[in-house]
């Protein structure tokens, strides 16, 4: 939920009318590490008065508990996409192609990925999908690192062309400095892609099973980041196994599955047995 004056008034009204309310958030301790004292107090005020809590990730749940939520009243309802639009099995992982999808802004950490890419095998390439104010700086950085010929900037892509890019890639990579969830990881998993995700993509800890369908890395450790990229491409058969595992794990994030957390929270507040 948004923590603004309107929400605070709504909470006060619910309390006055004795109407229970549910707090929902995708915020995490990482994404909210720089908020001010007043914002922290407002979060605590709301959460301590909520009848139940819905969190969009395990990290969001941990944040609500840190603000005073009762863990027994917390329910997970993951953020998701229409997975049916993206689900696609894949057989060929021989292209050695990394894919990034997202904005070209400082927060997304592409400036951390490029030095790592420069340390990897020269036959590994990167396709960057998205637009943003950092594009010129990233182009210059790639030139200085001598990897211009290993990178494609495709600009903004959506719909079926984007789904084709997912399908034609071999590994998805998200080097973000901060993301509450990282829905592009789930899109890539639906397309049977192994994933290398930043530890600052808070949803990655729910989406990526370490060593099974990908890896979670510290994007600020350039050498370790590069090693993980080389490692994931080292065995094509293993890469295919990881892609298959991504495809299988993605099904747990179908609408009907993630909605269960919201339904359970409503049932709890209404006094019914949680399924």
Language-model-derived ranges and their functions:
Residues 177:
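Aromatic "clamp/platform" in nucleotide-sugar-dependent glycosyltransferases that forms part
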Residues 194-198:
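Short hydrophobic beta-strand element within catalytic cores of glycosyltransferases
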Residues 43-88:
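Donor nucleotide-sugar binding/catalytic pocket of nucleotide-sugar-dependent glycosyltransferases
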Residues 4-5, 19-37, 49-52:
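A short, histidine- and acid-enriched strand-loop-helix "catalytic/donor-clamping" loop
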